[in-house]
Every structure is written in structure tokens, then in C-alpha cells.
A protein has these predicted regions:
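Serine-esterase "nucleophile elbow" of acetyl-processing enzymes
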Residues: 1-60, 65, 70-79
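Short, solvent-exposed mixed-charge patches
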Residues: 1, 239-240
Length: 240
């Protein structure tokens, strides 16, 4: 699968590079992915002076090693101005063919950043969405994750690795994991749950069908978080 191309010229190109969260499967229409929402909101903000194209280069089921294998075709060949890197949920899968060590995961992120930066593009690292263990098939189908409490326990460790790599490389971070957890905390405040750590309260944002993929509302939340990072840091356009 290759990145979506744009039918008309635009001044700024964003490539959203990641797994099924970026792709928007299996429950989200293409127009409701964070890539599409972000494109619309940035174009609404800057109007005709600057136009944006956000290409969706998400492929479901991929870890960072598989992402690196297609980075030339799906990212670099599109001459992006900004690349959003969203991986991690498949790097922690229990199957040996998918699972990557913490060290390899971090090194793959560094290599992605190096290749993109060499082309003169900016990078935003994204942490993964939380996993709702009660709905998640991997959490229920194996004892592998018990050493971390549950699958989301390991997910949180890999989210922290992304934060560390972003700090190390002095790259912007969009902390999606923290944003979703904050929504759970707000739900606890409103009395909708007795414990925000029971992430099932996030079923509006993360599908109860699988406990991992964002719903349309979750995609909108991701887009809003990315929008905030881009416009407050003037990553693509300096606002006058």
C-alpha cells in the first residue's frame, strides 16, 4: 500500500506514517482519519495563502522494522515538509515475528528520524493510543503480558521510549497516550468511573470491538492534539 497522493498542488505536504491507527482501520472512514481531519483544519486556518496535503501512509499490522522497509517509497519519495511518526502497538505484540526489543524499537525510531531529517523535513513523534485490556484480543489470548500487569503495561513502557527518543533528538512530541489517559481522568472527575485506570471508560474514543483502534471520535482527538503541536510551534508556517 502506498501513501495517498493529492490531485492538486499544495504548498505544504504532511506524511502521516504509521500503523492501523494512522490508516484508520477497521472502523473509520478515510475522511474521518486524523490525517484527513488535520488537513481540513490546517487549510481552514491558513486559507488560500498556504495549502496543506496530509498523505495517509498508515499500514495496519506493521511494526517499526516493517515501516522502515517502506519509508523510501511511502515517505521520502513524497518530499514531505513534515512527517508524523506513529508506531508502537505492533512492536509489543507477543508473536516473535512481530515483537521488537526496547533497544531495537528505539533504534528504528532514530533511523526513521535520521532519514527524514536528511531530506530537510520536520518530524513529530507520536506515542500510541492506550489499550483497553477488557476488549483487547491479545490481552485475553495469552499470558505473555502478565509480567507487565497487562498489555497496556508494556504499551506504556514503549510510549515512554518514544518520549525519550524525542527528547534525545530534540524532536517535537505529540503525546497521544497521555491525551487519551487525560480523557479517562476527566471521566473520573465527572463520576463516570470510579478509577480512571479502568480504561474501558474510553470506549467513546477507542473501539470496544478490539480495545486498540480509535473510533472516529478518537481520530478527532488525535487530530486536535497534532494540530496543537503544529500551530503552537510554528512547524510549517509562522503565524503573523
Amino acid at each position: 500500500m502506498t501513501a495517498r497522493t493529492c490531485s492538486i498542488y499544495k504548498n505544504k505536504r504532511i506524511v502521516c506514517f504509521g500503523d492501523s491507527v494512522t490508516q484508520g482501520v477497521p472502523h473509520v472512514a478515510p475522511a474521518d482519519t486524523f490525517a484527513a481531519i488535520l488537513e481540513r483544519r490546517l487549510n481552514a486556518l491558513y486559507g488560500p495563502q498556504v495549502q496543506f496535503c496530509a498523505s495517509n501512509a498508515g499500514v495496519g499490522g506493521e511494526n517499526t522494522a516493517e515501516g522502515l522497509a517502506r519509508i523510501q517509497r511511502d515517505v521520502l519519495d513524497h518530499s514531505p515538509d513534515l512527517v508524523l511518526i506513529e508506531f508502537g502497538l505492533n512492536d509489543i505484540r507477543y508473536e516473535p515475528a512481530k515483537r521488537l526489543s526496547e533497544e531495537q524499537f528505539a533504534e528504528n525510531l532514530r533511523e526513521m528520524h535520521r532519514l527524514i531529517a536528511e531530506r530537510g523535513a520536520a518530524v513529530i513523534f507520536m506515542t500510541p493510543t492506550p489499550i483497553i485490556g477488557a476488549y483487547h484480543v491479545y490481552s485475553q489470548g495469552t499470558d505473555y503480558y502478565k509480567q507487565w500487569g497487562d498489555c497496556n503495561g508494556l504499551n506504556a513502557i514503549y510510549a515512554e521510549i518514544i518520549r525519550q527518543v524525542a527528547r534525545e533528538l530534540e524532536a517535537p512530541l505529540c503525546d497521544i497516550y497521555a491525551a487519551f489517559v487525560q480523557e479517562a481522568v476527566k471521566a473520573e472527575f465527572r463520576g463516570e468511573t470510579f478509577d480512571y485506570r479502568d480504561l474501558s471508560v474510553l470506549s467513546r474514543y477507542i473501539s470496544s470491538r478490539d480495545g486498540v483502534h480509535p473510533t472516529a471520535a478518537g481520530q478527532e482527538l488525535i487530530a486536535a492534539e497534532l494540530y496543537a503541536v503544529i500551530v503552537t510551534r510554528d512547524l510549517l508556517v509562522t503565524r503573523v
